[in-house]
Amino acid sequence: MKTKDYVQELNGLTTEQLLNREKELKEQLFNLRFQLATGQLENTASLKTVRKNIARVKTVLRQQELNN
């Protein structure tokens, strides 16, 4: 998914949905780090992608917080 599409999707979500998305991404990042440590991870770029997506979710949450 392209970045602009992903951010637009995030902007349409409620605060609760964003918090759930952040939790899911953090779990995914944990699993990826575990795979990296055990040598099972083939696509190391996925770590960067998930980290950036977590930052995007946090940014949208902060924007919503400031707008309310």
Curated annotation (Swiss-Prot):
Protein origin, superkingdom: Bacteria
Q: Which residues cross the membrane?
A: none
Q: Which GO terms describe its cellular component?
A: cytosolic large ribosomal subunit
Tell me a GO biological process for this protein: translation
Name the Gene Ontology molecular function terms of this record. structural constituent of ribosome
Alphabetical list of InterPro entries matching this protein: Ribosomal_protein_uL29 (IPR050063), Ribosomal_uL29 (IPR001854), Ribosomal_uL29_CS (IPR018254), Ribosomal_uL29_sf (IPR036049)
What name does this protein carry? Large ribosomal subunit protein uL29
Native organism is: Limosilactobacillus fermentum (strain NBRC 3956 / LMG 18251) (Lactobacillus fermentum)
- Taxonomically, what lineage is the organism? Bacteria, Bacillati, Bacillota, Bacilli, Lactobacillales
Gene name as annotated: rpmC
